[in-house]
């Protein structure tokens, strides 16, 4: 992916870009690895790169010039609508103030990868489902469980045989994804989850057995990377965190069409 990014930032125009790498956790080496690779490749390509630490970052406007500053920086980094690209990394969605910084950059005209709306929709599994549904994409049947007492109504609405999948609306790395094999199990888990957090948001989905899932990255209307994550042995999930193996994956024509439509 980094090689494709390097090609992207050099092919569109000869002038230099100003690149912001926006991260909520720039000091965490494990979580910041991908962002750091963007920094390295951007600099190799001769671009100006600035890491924005969203905690405490501010934007100033003076003499028709916008600058963004980290809390520990007095010099800042000039930004504009004509030459600045922001690559948003890390858990920026965790705080509204972080997202508000993205909104400010968008208002200035900075090219955002990705925008606040995209991040918020992608972080919510049901909003993602609705958004993709708007474009006619094929998806597993999905129903919300709006509160603890409506799980049975939701199950009837799903109208799917067991096993099914239950998920928290937010979560990553396979956390909050549950394999449900009976009514007794779903009732017990719903009660448990609502007991732990009365504001928890849940959905249930039709279970479709597969040997893995496909991840695709689309940039500027082009597919720049694709991979397959194989199901972890003894599990139903294919997340890398619990040990899924990853390999290159050539997309079919239908998959290309669906991915571009989704993007």
Language-model segments: which ranges?
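Residues at the starts of beta-strands that form the adenosine-phosphate
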Residues: 17-18, 48
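Beta-strand scaffold of nucleotide-dependent catalytic cores
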Residues: 189-190, 205, 213-231, 262
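Short glycine-/acidic-enriched loop or helix-start segments at secondary-structure transitions
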Residues: 31-32, 97-99, 175-176, 214, ...
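A long amphipathic alpha-helix within ATP-dependent nucleotide-binding catalytic cores
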Residues: 201, 206, 237-263
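Active-site nucleotide/adenylate-binding loops and adjacent lid/helix of ATP-dependent enzymes
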Residues: 18-24, 35-36, 69, 80-81, ...
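Conserved N-proximal alpha/beta basic substrate-recognition cap immediately N-terminal to
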Residues: 26-141
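Charge-dense, intrinsically disordered terminal/linker segments
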Residues: 1-17
């Amino acid at each position: 992916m980094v090689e494709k990014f390097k090609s992207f930032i050099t092919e569109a125009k000869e002038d230099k870009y100003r690149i912001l790498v926006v991260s909520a956790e720039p000091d965490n080496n494990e979580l910041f690895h991908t962002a750091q690779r963007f920094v390295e490749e951007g600099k190799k390509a001769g671009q100006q790169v600035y890491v924005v630490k969203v905690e405490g970052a501010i934007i100033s406007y003076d003499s028709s010039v916008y600058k963004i500053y980290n809390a520990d920086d007095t010099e800042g980094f000039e930004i504009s609508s004509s030459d600045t690209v922001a690559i948003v990394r890390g858990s920026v969605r965790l705080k509204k103030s972080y997202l508000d910084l993205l909104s400010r950059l968008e208002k200035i005209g900075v090219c955002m990868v990705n925008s606040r709306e995209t991040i918020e929709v992608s972080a919510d599994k049901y909003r993602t489902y609705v958004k993709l549904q708007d474009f006619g994409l094929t998806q597993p049947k999905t129903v919300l469980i709006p509160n603890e007492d409506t799980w049975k109504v939701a199950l009837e609405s799903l109208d799917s045989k067991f096993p099914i999948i239950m998920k928290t609306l937010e979560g990553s790395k396979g956390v909050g994804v549950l394999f449900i094999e009976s009514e007794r199990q779903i009732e017990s888990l719903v009660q448990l989850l609502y007991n732990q957090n009365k504001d928890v948001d849940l959905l249930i989905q039709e279970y479709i057995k597969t040997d893995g899932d496909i991840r695709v990255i689309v940039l500027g209307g082009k597919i720049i990377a694709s991979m397959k994550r194989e199901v972890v042995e003894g599990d139903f999930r294919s997340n890398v965190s619990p040990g899924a193996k990853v390999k290159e994956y050539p997309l079919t024509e239908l998959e290309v069409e669906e991915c571009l439509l989704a993007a």
